Amino acid sequence: MASNSTKSFLADAGYGEQELDANSALMELDKGLRSGKLGEQCEAVVRFPRLFQKYPFPILINSAFLKLADVFRVGNNFLRLCVLKVTQQSEKHLEKILNVDEFVKRIFSVIHSNDPVARAITLRMLGSLASIIPERKNAHHSIRQSLDSHDNVEVEAAVFAAANFSAQSKDFAVGICNKISEMIQGLATPVDLKLKLIPILQHMHHDAILASSARQLLQQLVTAYPSTRMVIVSLHTFTLLAASSLVDTPKQIQLLLQYLKNDPRKAVKRLAIQDLKLLANKTPHTWSRENIQALCECALQTPYDSLKLGMLSVLATLSGTIAVKHYFSIASGNVGSSPRSSDLVKLAQECCYHNNRGIAAHGVRVLTNITVSCQEKDLLALEQDAVFGLESLLVLCSQDDSPGAQATLKIALNCMVKLAKGRPHLSQSVVETLLTQLHSAQDTARILMCHCLAAIAMQLPVLGDGMLGDLVELYKVIGRSATDKQQELLVSLATVIFVASQKALSAEVKAVIKQQLESVSNGWTVYRIARQASRMGNHDMARELYQTLLTQVASEHFYFWLNSLKEFSHAEQCLTGLQEENYSSALSCIAESLKFYHKGIASLTAASTPLNPLSFQCEFVKLRIDLLQAFSQLICTCNSLKTSPPPAIATTIAMTLGNDLQRCGRISNQMKLSMEEFRSLASRYGDLYQASFDADSATLRNVELQQQSCLLISHAIEALILDPESASFQEYGSTGAAHADSEYERRMMSVYNHVLEEVESLNRKYTPVSYMHTACLCNAIISLLKVPLSFQRYFFQKLQSTSIKLALSPSPRNPAEPIAVQNNQQLALKVEGVVQHGSKPGLFRRIQSVCLNVSSTLQSKSGQDYKIPIDNMTNEMEQRVEPHNDYFSTQFLLNFAILGTHNITVESSVKDANGIVWKTGPRTTIFVKSLEDPYSQQIRLQQQQAQQPLQQQQQRNAYTRF
């Protein structure tokens, strides 16, 4: 079973080399473990983590760890050390060990060795296993005993194990706390050992009493041992304990501020700042105004730039949270106090022009956060200070290529974007500063500044026209070399130009871009610029760039991919010629667009591979094709009112049938079909949305907008023609347009609002169906198609990758072979799964739980038909499980009372942290053959045999009577 399930799990893994199935790979490693050469044994041991990564199901992992435990038991210390490292690297797979008792028994046998190094490695091994054996009393006893050892290596290992078990087990933490306390306070304990014992106290957070006793001990240590190392370790442990227990966080903040203010040692001050930063990130709501005020006073008084930088970093973190609002809300309640006169603002204003770049960056960050957060206050002076500080920082850092200067520049540019969004009236001066500085900046800084300009232009498109001229002039003079930075700058600047140009690019701008690309750019740069053009709706530019790339690729898959993009861009370009009130021209434009779309989907299908099936891209384009066809069909239906008006007897037919719509003739039925078609398309867009778990938010919003377009047209058909009396417009408001994140979304929302206003004005005004109604529908279609389609990032690039692999037990040796089960028994189906991630797990969303749906259908009956309750004929079950360390498992009991072959389907979907369900798959199928149990079969045969003589006697009697 394990072999087959794991083999199917790896069937689609493309590692580029000849892969073995799980059993073969394990046998290869087992052969190495049995080798007489130490080098081969070590090589086999260290290859186990890769085996676990490729075959992450419990049966193989259990077998592998048992083999490693045998090596640990009989091998030398070097092999034991290798096994320990493998165990620590494979921590997420430890819960998949099925025979925990046997595994621990083999490991634990080494604890009785006379070799202290062997005992030390065993203790570290037990500590690494604390997550699966937190309450093993023999392990607890061995750790306590080893803490009293005279061998330093063994004692250090015991300290490591004690820390791990304290984090996992409340009983162990309660039992070991007093012993740790005695050892720390004991005179015989060396100082180095005390420094290693103190961090164990950070895990004493399982209950309030334990945490309180640990805090008291740490308080005594800080007072009794004033040496620098002891104070640093004790304070940091103090902070971690407070952050975990949450109860004593305000006291800990006060203690750290006290040491920051009064202790003269810079090392202690640095530690206090580091811990304050940790608490500011984790619990900003626990900071009082007095805490922030004390930190400001320390920063104002300190003469050391390094300490001032650290304190400002803490204040910058707090300024972006609720703490700063609390600070100013209390300050404004004091007589004669205002935000402009507070120490926090005074400190930030002083630091904005500091000669240290880091201090200046944090100063403007604090000012920006205050300006954006406290919008209800009159902060004109602070706004100007923030803008001037950002300008000076921009001038300073844009001329420097060093990593420190670029990091500071990123902070300043982020503040500019935040300021432009929070205070739109400041955006014009921010943009002018960026454009002025763009000409003289270094290439590295230019790239970052272009990203900033693009972000501001996306939020405030009204600024785009003003910056376009400067950007085009700059584009003419850059790109004199083919360095990576120059290529990156070409892409960044082209992106800003696409964002800034609200409509189609002018011929002059296109000529400038193409001229630069022809001179110094490589193919990858051209592709990235074309990709941005497709994203921003500049399809004519994108088509020309894709055309130039077709002959520059070596793979046919890449050729077909680029060709499909060229055809899609050409198809969208055809729709730019649409004009309102010109419906025949609209039909020809849509037909022309569909022609290129069909060419493109053929190329896109040819570009897909088993490892990269391009499923999202294909489905998105198919939906676009179907949507265009539905639009075309609806325009033809509207035109049919002229070409095929209602017959003269239509009113009589309507009265006879009792359906008032029949007086409109055949158009009423066609409109009903169109409405159902658009609702079906909206449902398919919804399915695509749910299947795109790894997509970025902009792509998902794009899919959502396409779905809303379909719903809008179906609603318009219903409100104008099919059911104008019951049409409601309350749920369709103009909310959301102000919060649009892109120009495409902004334009689509504007079209939606305009169409809804037109439909509402016509609703109940004219009796359906009139030419006014059909014209309104056709104009709505043209308005939607005139907004250039945006191909978002997920169409080109997958930043997050998440997949689920399922293994079913029992599973047949051959996938087509059914599993035999008796009809009077239930099948226990075990479903195991592994969540696999790419290089950036959880970038957009994470899996909170996995929903497993199991259903069975009868494929073919065998034997006689019996009357069986309907409940026994089908199985339909659902369970939710939460993955732990990317692994989950559950079981289902299935009933197969009807004899025959049943098809079992297991389908998985996931729920993210926001409670949204995503249909990610996969879908797995196995077959079960339900057989009659022997006892029932025997009874049935006996009954048949008993009935045979009776039937023969009845036949003789019948012959006799005859």
From Swiss-Prot:
One Gene Ontology CC term in the entry: cytoplasm
Coiled coil: none
Keywords: Chromosome, Cytoplasm, DNA damage, Nucleus, Phosphoprotein
Phosphoprotein among keywords: yes
Primary subcellular site in the record, as a coarse category: nucleus
Domain of life: Eukaryota
One of the GO BP terms on file: cellular response to ionizing radiation
InterPro entries for the chain: ARM-like, ARM-type_fold, INTS7, INTS7_C, INTS7_HB, INTS7_N
Record-annotated disulphide pairs: none
Modified residues (Phosphoserine): 338, 809
Function as written in the Swiss-Prot or TrEMBL entry: Component of the integrator complex, a multiprotein complex that terminates RNA polymerase II (Pol II) transcription in the promoter-proximal region of genes.
Family: Belongs to the Integrator subunit 7 family.
Identification of the protein by name: Integrator complex subunit 7
Organism: Bos taurus
